[in-house]
Amino acid sequence: MTRPRTSPATPGADTADDPLTDPATGTGPRPVAGTAADGTPTGAATDPDPGTATLATATPRELRGHLTARLDEPARGWLRRALDEAVDHPGTHGPISVWELRIAEAGRRCGPVHADAARVLILHAARADADALSRVYYQGTGAERRAVLYALPHLVPGPEGLPLVEDALRTNDTRLVTAAVGPYAARHLDAHAWRHAVLKCLFTGVPVDAVADLDHRAHRDTELARMLTDYAAERTAAGRAVPADLHRVLTLTDPPATPSAPATDHG
Amino acid sequence: MRLFDPHIHMTSRTTDDYEAMYAAGVRAVVEPSFWLGQPRTSPASFLDYFDSLLGWEPFRAAQHGIAHHCTLALNPKEANDPRCVAVLDELPRYLVKDQVVAVGEIGYDSMTPAEDTALAAQLELAAAHELPALVHTPHRDKLAGLRRTLDVVRESALPVDHVLIDHLNETTVKEAKDSGCWLGFSVYPDTKMDEERMVAILRAYGPERVLVNSAADWGRSDPLKTRKVADLMLAEGFDEDDVDRVLWRNPVAFYGRSGRLTLDVTTPDATHEGNSILRGAPKGPGGGPAEDPGAGPAGAVADRHGATAVPGA
Ligand SMILES: [Zn+2]
């Protein structure tokens, strides 16, 4: 099942000489790989890359290799220059630093599919610390905020970035929630906040695959098990299906939980 | 039939509207920043509003299969309030964002010196950021307002073909067309312009450089007006190509001057793709509207969209 698409809305886009900007339609940069009009994956989506690395876990080197293989030449050149600039001028200059401008325009230069990875790389190149990441996050679009969240585990060793994760977990934007429950949250969120993050994933339909270190943190968490069984009971009482992910997490909490009877025994 | 509403305030609309718009064929919208009905008292409330137009609202739109872009500016009415004018200093850092496809809506409300200043300054900002500008014409003293607007546009660094003059009507269309600007018409239930008058204007002046919008907001308005104009155009003898030109290709060409239009709705994929770097390859249902996972909400929405074949498509 696929989302509705609007690709047919850009006639001629596939035949434009310059794949970055289609003069016939005025549409901006298009992703090199993406999804065809009927929702079938194209390009990179079907290549043999196993896709096991995630934005939150891939090293900068892996990310760069991934992008270099997929961006077309103009986008590749733009990214190379943007990273060089960020390395050479990591600080703030004038009202806004050059690398922050590059963060802002990454979508139209690299296409929406690759913008996250490009932004994470620029943040790396600029050696953005917790203060810089906070500024980019709070002054950012949804897409820029997402990239900051993905960059956190690599760039901030301590808990200084937690307010950004907590901010993202308060939103109902599933793209932000997904990015917020990565390795940084696994490392730094306290037990109460982490349990609520897991529950929020179940509530908003974010697959718990996105939750970093889920097995380890859920193990023997009787309070999480209680919250899950209560939620399952609430769903059942309302005559609604219990998300499959809930049973999965409940199983991970191990001994106390009995997934087959989620509505009982844990009042 | 594919429709692009080039001026609609979705922040003021419900999810029912999004669903009805999608069913009617609307696949892309541009949301100009504007007056919220209740006056703002500080730049901070502008910034929260801009952030919403770059964050939450495009997410909402994407959940309904609609591409969302915005135009940002200090609106003419609040340009008169000294407490708000400082937002002009914050605009540059917003005008570089990916989803910002124009500066707007700017123009005149009461034609005051403060409005002169804000209009001229923001036309320069548009030129500096290589963005087009959405300039509305005032409700009161419209023809005089249009002339003064065109004077300021001609004095600015922005080429006329980067300017969309909006809320036009029978008395202002000719001079606006002669200026070389793009022509915007807001079709409302009972003011400004209706479908019949819109079609008559299209017959008299042709479809070149004409954009039609619903300008739907928190007032009495109808987010399906683009579709109603399209239907009446067909009934009155215009062909499908004319309709596509006015209601899709013209707005794509105008806002495309920003180099920032992305008409593929890719964002919901992030939900069920998790945080894989290989986003863009849908794996199946998941995610979607908040707070209702069990029933597979995204799948349900996709089904609904799939089943609602776009009328006339
Ligand atoms: Zn408006």
Model region roles, listed by residue range:
Chain A
Residues 1-126, 194-267:
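N-terminal alpha-helical scaffold/docking segments in eukaryotic complex subunits
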Residues 116-118, 122-227:
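Eukaryote-skewed repeat-based solenoidal scaffolds used as protein-protein interaction platforms
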